[in-house]
Amino acid sequence: MKLKRFLLPILAWSCLLYTSPSPRHEEFTGHLSSLQVGNVVCSDGNILSMDKFKQSDKEAVAIVFHINRSAETDNLGYAVYIHDMEPLAFADSLGIDQGTSASLTDEDGNENTYSLFNNDEVKSPIAIRTFDLWSYGQSAYIPSVRQLSFLFTVRHQINECITEVGGTPINLNPSECWLWSSTEVEGQKENKAWLYSMQSGTIQETPKDQPHKSRPVISIYTTK
C-alpha cells in the first residue's frame, strides 16, 4: 500500500499543526469519552467505530489500542498500524548510544524514535523506515517497551479488528512474535535494545544490528 499519497491529514492532526476546525470524526468527537479501543483510524484522519467504518468507503491505517486516562499525558491514546514493518536493524552498527531513555516504564516511543532518527553517529534502519511511511516527517513511531505492554494486553481484540479492516494480524507464534521496541538497554545502550514478545509479554535484550520486525504506532491528539 502506498501511504505517502494520502497521509498528510493524519500528520497534521497528530502533530497538532491543524489550524482549522477539527475534522468530522463521527464516532470520535474529539473528547476522551468518545474514543474506544478498537476504533479505526482512517487515512483522512477520521476515527470511526468498526460499524461506521464498514459502512464507509474509507481506508484504514491503524487501530486504537490504548486510551490515556491520566491528566499528565499530552495525548488521548495510541493506535497501531495495521501492517508489520519488514525486519530491519535497530542500528546499522554497534558501539553508539543512540540517546533513547532506556526506561521500561515511560510512554516515550515518539521521543525515542526521533532520537534514533536524529543521531549523526549511526543510522537506524527502523527509524528511517518509520519516517518514510509518512509524507512530511514524523507521525508514526516505534513504540517503547511500556507502549508495547499496552498493546500486548489487548492483542487478541486488536488482531480481530486488524483482520476486519484487511490488515496483517500481529503474529503471536513463538518464533515470529518478537517486535523491536524503541528502548535501548540501560547500561548497554551502545550495543543492545529490547525486543518485545507479543506471545508472552516478555522482553529480551538483543544486539542492535540484528534485523527484526516492528509495528509502528501513532499518538492521538485533538485541538479541542
In which residue ranges do the predicted regions lie?
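Carbohydrate-recognition loop of C-type lectin domains
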Residues: 200-207
